Each structure stands twice: as structure tokens, then as C-alpha cells.
Amino acid sequence: MTRSLKKNPFVANHLLKKINKLNNKAEKEIIVTWSRASTIIPTMIGHTIAIHNGKEHLPIYITDRMVGHKLGEFAPTLNFRGHAKNDNKSRR
């Protein structure tokens, strides 16, 4: 179910403060966050945000096409390595 349009998109307060502080300065720093549920808003465009995937932080550069999506969509948590090639040894 999608979020009601009466409500604003969810962005963690600490993440919003960090982005506003970096927008006031001319410097670009990597913002480290664990908030995968935060929605990407237009003020985040041009920043690099390191999103936690459960093991490490993956740096993701935010573009205009990502606006409206969640941060967690761009940091996959599972790493599928494929099925076993030869399963005959375990069947014996």
C-alpha cells in the first residue's frame, strides 16, 4: 500500500539535518546512514550517501531519477551466488 498524499515522505530527522548542513556548505562529504526506510527527496540530489546493507555501508550517488524511492532499494542485502553446479555427491 502506498503512503497517503496528505502525509509528507518519511525522511529520518538525523539524515535531514546532515543534508541541510551540507547544502549550506559548499563541500561534498559522504553521509553514512543506517536509515534504509528514508525516502529520497530533491534536496538529496548530488550527495553521496553510504547506505548500510547489514554488513557494510555502500556509497550511492543520488541522481534526479532516484527521487521518490527509498534508500534501501539501492543497497541490496542478499547476495545470491547461484545454485550448486553438481549435486550428485550429496545424493550418494
Curated annotation (Swiss-Prot):
SUPFAM superfamilies named among the record's database cross-references: Ribosomal protein S19
Keywords: Chloroplast, Plastid, Ribonucleoprotein, Ribosomal protein, RNA-binding, rRNA-binding
Listed GO MF terms: rRNA binding; structural constituent of ribosome
Compartment(s): Plastid, Chloroplast
GO biological process, one term: translation
Record function comment: Protein S19 forms a complex with S13 that binds strongly to the 16S ribosomal RNA.
Family named by the database record: Belongs to the universal ribosomal protein uS19 family.
Protein name: Small ribosomal subunit protein uS19c
